Amino acid sequence: MKVFLVNTAAILAGALFFAASFPNPLFNYGLPLLAWVAYAPVFWVIRRAGSTDTSLKKSGGGKGIIAALAVSALYGALYGYTAYRLLTPWLDSVHPLAGTFASVFQLAVMAVLFVFLKLAVILYPRKGYLLQWLIWVSYEYLRTIGFLGFPYGITGYTQWQYPLLIGIASIFGIWGVSALVLFPSVYLGAAFPNKNGVSFSKKNLLFFYRERLALAIWLGALGASLVFGAIQSNYIEGASTGTAKIALIQQNADPWKNDASETRRMLGVLTSLSSKALEDEPDTDLVVWPETAFVPRIYWHLTYRDNAESYALVKELMDFLAVQTVPFLIGNDDARLEVTASGKWERVDYNAALLIKRAEIMDVYRKNHLVPFAEHFPYEKTFPRLYQALLDTDTQFWKPGREKTVFAAGHLRFSAPICFEDCFGYISRDFTRNGAQFIVNLTNDAWAGSLSCQVQHLSMAVFRAVENRRSLVRAAVSGQTCAIGPTGKILAMAPPFTETALNVEIPLPTGSTPYSYWGDFWGILFAVFAAMLLLNGVFRFILRIIQTGREL
């Protein structure tokens, strides 16, 4: 019982350390240094959970190993649920059950992950910690792909405030930073006593001597990363060929929670803030409004005029834009008449960014990667009840766009990932490869009413700038409206939860990065190596059983 209580306490401590490392309600910018040891209790418990010896005689045979894997799964379930309940309390703002659903999903994922982590030290008793390191980074990569991709909680994002350290993301992506930060936890978890006791013995201290090469390599990699970050920072400062002046508008009111009269008032706020920004900086190159800042469908109501009140609002907006000499990038519901799966002509809605100059729509980007369940659910026929339940919660479903639009505004070329899209490296990479000189993120996190939620989102955007060596600006409904330099440094930020405009001037560096060239190759490489070592270990284990003539 004592062992169980100690292990449970360690798992709960690990979950708390994990959540505290990221921006959270107590520490809005997180405790990034804690991340370097936050997982140590977790890896320690995994080693202690049942047998770790491949000797069938010592482990109690196959039954002992299965029991160890089962116990590890239970600890994983506890860790997954607790860690993500603490990390994402703001999800309950979407729906009372959203946070619970996400935590239960992580419960299942972590239960499986812990089985593989336990298997690593069963198959490789001395060097299993290195395989655990590979497995965890692989897991972080895999959880970003597919319909359920959810990048919140990836270890490397805790370091967003350290430009010198995260410079290696221009080569390895976020995966290089995660690997660097994760290693001390894995190493310490292997060094701690893994039997019933909790005090160090001579055997545990010998671990540091035996595994000194791995520690030396990590220390060398850490030092090299800092040196590279410093060199790259100096290089980028001298490599910019020009600048862009941008006005970022923050209206501080969720546009989807307002009626028609409030929408009209909000239009007045947006136009007033824009006029003030242009008055302060007359030579501004671009004005940016946040995601769906203006709700009435601009193209639709200009074309079909089926709602007099909405058309009047759109006309008021276009009258304002007609006298502006500066192009505006506006977040809007872009509705089009298309043939749907039913074979009928119907209105289809896209979450979009419209580039408008003198009341003319110059170009449109339609959000490619939609938020699962909240914006998109492609399994209507497979799960009709769930689909209807989502609709009943007043969910706004969109059709995903396909084009990787690069906008042209005078001498500037830029792209505009919308909200959730700046959480994924491949999207900004695609834009950069298509010729974008800088990235503009339009976002709305006002629904959460949480500063820590907004800062968590910001922390991921920082890496998109570093990965592609491109400046990135964010126009957010309620915060964090800001400009991020190509090194990941925050150049300017508007105060959150205020109606304001932020005028920024950003550098426009040229060239590309290794990450822009090969993308998430290193995340894939971690996964491939982890799979190969696991398969090799299982093969050797089975061969050993055959040689000893024992049964599982």
Regions found by a protein language model. Give the residues of each.
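CN hydrolase (nitrilase-like) catalytic-core segments centered on the catalytic cysteine
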Residues: W133-L134, L286, F294, D306-I330, ...
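Membrane-embedded alpha-helical bundles of multi-pass enzymes
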Residues: M1-N234, S450, R464, A476, ...
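A generic fold-level signal
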Residues: N28, T241, V323, E346-V348, ...
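Short, conserved active-site loops that position catalytic residues or coordinate cofactors/metal ions
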Residues: L26-P41, R85-L86, Q250-Q251, D283-T303, ...
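Soluble catalytic regions of membrane-associated enzymes that act on cell-envelope
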Residues: G229-F373, F407-G410, A416, F420-D422
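Active-site catalytic loop in hydrolytic enzyme cores
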Residues: P89-G99, Y124, T144-F172, S310, ...
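Non-cytosolic juxtamembrane linkers/loops
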Residues: K2-V6, L219-D280, A446-H457, V462-E467, ...
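Membrane-interface helix/helix-cap signal primarily in integral membrane proteins
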Residues: T340, I361-V364, L370-F377, R429, ...
